[in-house]
A protein has these predicted regions:
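Low-complexity, Ser/Thr/Pro-rich intrinsically disordered linker/stalk segments at domain junctions
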Residues: 2, 59-61, 150
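Hydrophobic beta-strand positions in extracellular immunoglobulin-like domains
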Residues: 10, 41, 52-53, 67, ...
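Short beta-strand segments within Ig-like beta-sandwich modules, predominantly Fibronectin type-III
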Residues: 73-79, 164-171
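Beta-strand-rich modules
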Residues: 1-14, 85-105, 177-197
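Short strand-edge motifs at loop-to-beta-strand transitions and within beta-strands
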Residues: 81-83, 173-175
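Pro/Thr/Ser/Gly-rich low-complexity, intrinsically disordered linker/stalk tracts
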Residues: 14-58, 90, 104-148, 182, ...
Length: 220
């Protein structure tokens, strides 16, 4: 990385000849290994945060990554941290390594870091809603996980205008929604929740709660 000004001259038994013209030269080598501090999963992506090593005396022009322990290397186009790896499959574990590239060639690869990308869960399917007294019972089937375990559901009783988190958290079916008014129609929708957040809502299914039985009359 240091620039030197070089001249040469020939020597024989008679002595030293005239020196050559001045030529500048900067020695260089491949860049040093980057240090990966984190690999953060996203929706079909992974974001790699790293600290660059020495550039070897020549500007780093690219960072490359491998997902197969160095068999195949792909360009990111990035020249600084962070870099984003895309087109991954949610729910699949990847072993990520990176290396720096300059005009001298490819540097040594970093250590491996595992990451599993994930996105929002798919919409659940409501198979039935049964009205009861001040409550409804919702039978549902989970959609896709998005690559991350479904941890809870949210529900709406007004066709998606407002949403309530299921408490306590549960992923079992059926789901009981209580605290409703008797003899009232409700338009039920459900969302699944995972580490990425709340997914899209199910289609709406309507149900009417039952009325409480009338008080009996004692005639004698």
């Amino acid at each position: 990385g240091t620039t030197y000004s070089v001249r040469i001259r020939a020597v024989n038994v008679a002595g030293s000849g005239a020196q050559s013209n001045l030529v500048s030269v900067t020695p260089r080598t491949v860049p040093a290994t980057p240090t990966v501090s984190s690999v953060t999963p996203g929706d079909s992506t992974a974001t790699v945060t790293f600290t660059a090593g020495s550039d070897g005396g020549s500007t780093v022009t690219n960072y490359e990554y491998t997902l197969d322990n160095g068999v195949t290397w792909l360009s990111t186009g990035a020249v600084a941290s962070p870099l984003t790896i895309s087109a991954l499959t949610n729910g699949t574990s990847y072993s990520v390594r990176i290396r720096a590239v300059n005009i001298a060639g490819n540097g040594a690869q970093s250590g491996a870091t595992s990451v599993t990308p994930y996105g929002l869960p798919g919409a659940p399917t409501i198979s039935s809603v049964t009205g009861g007294i001040a409550q409804v019972s919702v039978a549902l089937t989970a959609g896709t996980t998005g690559g991350s375990t479904i941890t809870n559901y949210e529900y709406s009783v007004d066709n998606g205008s407002t949403w309530t988190t299921r408490t306590p958290a549960a992923v079992t079916s059926p789901m009981t929604i209580s605290g409703l008014a008797n003899g009232t129609r409700y338009d039920i929708r459900i969302k699944a929740v995972n580490a990425a957040g709340s997914g899209p809502a199910s289609t709406s299914v309507s149900s009417t709660t039952k009325n409480s039985p009338a008080a009996p009359t004692i005639v004698s």
